[in-house]
Amino acid sequence: MEKKWWKESIVYQIYPRSFKDSNGDGIGDLNGITEKMEYLEKLGVNVVWLSPVYQSPNDDNGYDISDYRAIMTEFGTMEDFDRMLAAAHEHGIKIVMDLVVNHTSDEHPWFVESRKSKDNPYRDYYIWREGKDGKEPNNWGSCFSGPAWEYDEETGMYYLHLFSKKQPDLNWDNPKVREEVFDMMNWWLKKGVDGFRMDVISLISKKPDLPDGKPGINGYASFNEPANGPHVHEYLQEMREKVLNNADTITVGECSGVTLEEAKKYARSDEKELNMVFQFEHMDVDADADNKWTDKKMDLREMKAVLTKWQKGLEDIAWNSLFWENHDQPRSVSRYADDSAKYHDVSAKMLATCIHMMQGTPYVYQGEELGMTNVPFTSIDQFRDLDSINAYRELVEEQHVFTAEEMMRYLCRKSRDNARTPFQWDDSAYAGFSTVEPWIMVNPNYKEINAKKQVDDPESVFNYYRKLIALRKEKEIIVYGTYDLLLPESEEIYMYTRTLGEEKLLVVCNFSEKEVAVEIPEEFRKGSYLIANYPEGEIKEQMTIRPYEAFVLEK
């Protein structure tokens, strides 16, 4: 297998609005990130992915961009960005930009022009259609509830927005749009950024006839309906030729709705398109087929089957990304394990062991390395996320699919705002994130869970992440070894091996609060511990795995 620096990297995702406020306005900013470079270096990560920092009206927290070559005023200036980039590079950390080019803001100059008239030179930068029988052109739904079409009175036509109505979709079939995007990407690469995380990149190519899809719980087809369209690979290969080959970059595509076969095309090892993709099949294990708003618990057997499918399916063909969390997902320790005081630390360490020991590039979302948890929201007024607020309005107030109590329960479990509360730096007011009340509430458990408390505690979740990250840098087998699942039918234990030549590792993770008896394969019984989240017990044929225990044995 060919060795690459991006396969050996550990990526840390920063959601700038919630990371560190340096100027006392309650909003995180670029200078706050610069301030914390030593913390990131201490953790051991070597790539930072920044959620969008471009100029934006902030309808969807920066994923609605009005100027790709300017910095959001709340986050600082371009000089602040340059200073942060230089500081990152001084600390041995590469910077990856969030590239949002499926859509722009409706306040972007291209769209302002596009909606003026049917013959405007920018009209074809976006996707406009006539209505059908007095309604939308098709039954596609927006990711954020309601239809994916907005009627525009100025020209009497509808424009497509797979996300909010303030995020009109770009028309990638127009070569001028592609040239504009590629030119902008080259501009950022010349500035010195090291790569791109590509937002919903699997959606950029729509089928020309825009066919109806299967309706979901709210009567609309999924926003994923256009995923993996007819020209998506052609456009990404063009991007590779005109942009990505100009620098030694890391690229990861967010590919909602991607299949294993499609992923092989996006992230083949011949590097004609992307280095890797984010797939979300494992994130859907605790959702219903047409509805994520549920408090359904994860079935570990299904989770193992999905992760194993991706581990084995991409082996020697493409590269996996490894993650439990990001800015769109709730906190993993609350979602998949036990965030109670009794089991919080071992749970967070177990989840980290399970995902970091697989083949692929691991992604750590800010606060995950502390075991930050979901938030005990009590009112819809505490939410800031468009997705959550719109879903509550649509499913409770308009369609009466759920009661207010049910929906609050689902939001507390699944809302994106669980990941977006301020980073918990210390136990001072507002968790040391800001000197004033932040843009969104602080999780009340910040006095127990914070960076200051953990950084100097050798037994903390933070220092366990440091060990895992150091091991990955030290041992090639963790990066390049092949993966094989054991005990597929166990409802509590996730056990797998990694193999590279004569070397072999055994990874054992208990996803339950039960003690579970497990037989250790013979070849590991005379082995040694590589890492463990409990005091190490004697290695023998039959071992009792303690609640949320995780360990790795080396042959």
Describe the predicted segments one by one.
Residues 1-528, 532-555:
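Active-site and adjacent substrate-binding regions of carbohydrate-active enzymes
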